[in-house]
């Protein structure tokens, strides 16, 4: 999708090795970047970060068994089939950064345009996302809970 494409391009242009998969294989044929590689099965691929950016509800009790990543951080909405999956991922040592945090940057960008907010205010709000992720990760470790549970208090 368009979100995944932009993310892959940014990461690859910064020198990261990016491995991508898409249901629509014709989209993969159009990729022309030496740091982007096409793979068939993203779920079992050994990687640092798995970034689902299109379909929701892709993580369920069955699909997470084959995951071979350290972090899940993607722009797809509602990636978990149900909220208990966040705890299952946590139990497996996989950090799941909830889509509500990741996608909040888009909402902040919209408010900048719609409400005529200045760059300083917008940048401050964007930095607050990173702060909340770090704070949530700390609380998640301290309370031995998923990041999704830890951030519930931080979102309000």
Task: Give a label for each model feature.
Residues 2-7, 28, 58-62, 80-82, ...:
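Short glycine/serine/threonine-rich phosphate/pyrophosphate-binding segments
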Residues 24, 55-56:
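A generic "binding-loop/recognition-motif" signal
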Residues 51-55, 76-77:
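Short glycine-/small-residue-rich Rossmann-like dinucleotide-binding loops
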Residues 40-47, 56-73, 84:
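Rossmann-fold NAD(P) dinucleotide-binding segment
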Residues 1-49:
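Glycine-rich phosphate/diphosphate-binding loop of Rossmann-like nucleotide-binding domains
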Residues 8, 17, 37-38, 62, ...:
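Metal-centered catalytic cores of metalloenzymes
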Residues 70-156:
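Adenosine-phosphate binding glycine-rich loop
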Residues 10, 30, 63-66, 88:
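Well-formed, non-transmembrane alpha-helical positions, independent of function
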